[in-house]
C-alpha cells in the first residue's frame, strides 16, 4: 500500500507541472491593469505558440481613466490601442524554472511600432501572473500635442495569465 501511494504521488506531481510556455500549439490569455503617464486602464493579450520559442498574438489596451488636456476629455479612439505582436519565449533557453517565461518581443499597432519585455510565472497548469513593459520605437504621429502620447509611451502592465 505504501509503494502504491508513493507511485500515485509521483504520477500526480509529474503530470501536473505548471509549465509557462510549451511551444507550438500553446495558447496564453492575459488580462490586467495598464499604467502610463496620464492614464490607467485595462490590458489583455492573446498569444499563440508557433514554435519551440516563438509566439504570435494580439494585445488590446483601453484607458479607463485618462487625464483631460486643456479641459477636453479624451475620446474612445484616444483611449484605445490594438497591436499585433511577436514574442521570443526564452525562458527555457536561459534555463529558467519551467514555471517562468521571459519573452522580449515586437509589436505593430494603430499608434506605433514598438518593443516589449514580459515575464509570466504559473502557479498551476492554468493560472499565473504576468508583468510587461513596452516602449514605442517608431511613432506614426510624432506631434506631442493632444492625446498622441496615450498608448504611445512607456507602458507598464501587470495581471493574471491563463493557459487555454
Which residues does each predicted region cover?
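Outer-envelope beta-barrel architecture signal
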Residues: 3-5, 21-29, 40, 52-56, ...
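Short glycine/proline- and aromatic-enriched beta-strand/turn motifs that initiate or cap beta-hairpins
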Residues: 18-56, 86, 91, 161-163
Amino acid at each position: 500500500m505504501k509503494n502504491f501511494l508513493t507511485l500515485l504521488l509521483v504520477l500526480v506531481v509529474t503530470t501536473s507541472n505548471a509549465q509557462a510556455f510549451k511551444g507550438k500549439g500553446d495558447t496564453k490569455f492575459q488580462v490586467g491593469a495598464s499604467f502610463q503617464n496620464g492614464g490607467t486602464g485595462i490590458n489583455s493579450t492573446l498569444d499563440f505558440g508557433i514554435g519551440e520559442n516563438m509566439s504570435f498574438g494580439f494585445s488590446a489596451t483601453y484607458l479607463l481613466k485618462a487625464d483631460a488636456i486643456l479641459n477636453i476629455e479624451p475620446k474612445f479612439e484616444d483611449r484605445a490601442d490594438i497591436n499585433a505582436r511577436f514574442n521570443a519565449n526564452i525562458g527555457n533557453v536561459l534555463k529558467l524554472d519551467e514555471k517562468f517565461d521571459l519573452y522580449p518581443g515586437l509589436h505593430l499597432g494603430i499608434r506605433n511600432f514598438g518593443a516589449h519585455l514580459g515575464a509570466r510565472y504559473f502557479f498551476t497548469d492554468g493560472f499565473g501572473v504576468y508583468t510587461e513593459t513596452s516602449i514605442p520605437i517608431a511613432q506614426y504621429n510624432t506631434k506631442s500635442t493632444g492625446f498622441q502620447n496615450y498608448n504611445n509611451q512607456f507602458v507598464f502592465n501587470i495581471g493574471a495569465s491563463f493557459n487555454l
